[in-house]
């Protein structure tokens, strides 16, 4: 009775543990994989930090229009022969303590519009940094799509290889029975055994490819490698139903206004234009307004107690001197550049070169997008045609294999013919699986360039 009780406890614990493991496996669709990647990936955080830096640059350029404000206090002690400026008298062989304080402000009134243009340039740079964030996200979405479909393809190929192993093992078992009664030769057994080994090797390779693509996908999602996940399989039927032939020109025109690469290159060109305006501002005069207020104190300052008696004096107290010695200053300063050792000339020339570089980068981005879109349209049309051909090829190979097996079972075909037919059938099945997911992938690439959400209808 105790043995039965312990066995029941162990079995129940094993069942619950297995059930929890199954429940713990996370089912991930492509939309969920993209969402987790965009929420967690460090590359996006880095791009957002660069955007934050650009925002601080804009804030600083706006703040540069404001006047500065500073205050200073000086405390000095002096001994010996000197002329004291505060008391306006000569001090000899005595300690003198002086205190001075001031508050000042300075504001730039005109600087060739450099500050205003810098604000405009920094606004554009902030927009460019924002599009860089979108570009990083776009690239990650494409990487997720590639690795997701690669993992799905490898998994389905692995499942197909398991079916092929079961089929070849079944054939090996039948051949072994036929060999034992003298109906098959040793060569037939060797061929059959070789087919089992070949299929098992295919499974090992496909399993490794599946695990590698799944690991890459987890890394994009910033997910621990030990996390158990399964991927939702997309439906090919919905893709084929909506997969109308695309016009490359239409796709390109829509992609021009949606792809972050193009938007960023256009903004970078606008920044380069503003940099020319900033550089040209160096040729203009600079006008500044300064304002200051100050006061001071000296321990050597004295006053006569009696106006008629110059020998009777008293030391003027600190508060009285601070009040009496107040001073106010305001002034304008104008600096006119006459010759700056060609610095302004070089700055303008470099800014113009920067504009040419930005224009070249924009054109290059458009050219690359045009090539990619045209290639994507050709690829999706070719993928649909290849899937149709692969379907016909698999059906033909399946029929040929069944016919060869029937002939082999009655002794009308040898083991080499059966081995060849099975190999061709297996290859056709693999080609069909790859063609199927290639159609899905190529169709979603078009959605990617059009800026459409990447999502699948699941089987």
What are the roles of these predicted feature ranges?
Residues 2, 139-254, 379, 425:
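Periplasmic alpha-helical coiled-coil/stalk elements that build and connect Gram-negative outer-membrane
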Residues 22-70, 74, 80, 225, ...:
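Bacterial Sec-pathway N-terminal export signals of envelope proteins
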Residues 23, 79, 215, 431-459:
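Acidic, low-complexity, intrinsically disordered peripheral segments
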Residues 25-147, 287, 342-345, 355:
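Short flexible linkers and secondary-structure junctions
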Residues 72-107, 234-243, 277, 290-336, ...:
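Small/polar, glycine/serine/threonine/aspartate-rich low-complexity segments that form flexible
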Residues 179-183, 408-412, 449:
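A short glycine-centered flexible hinge/capping loop motif at secondary-structure junctions
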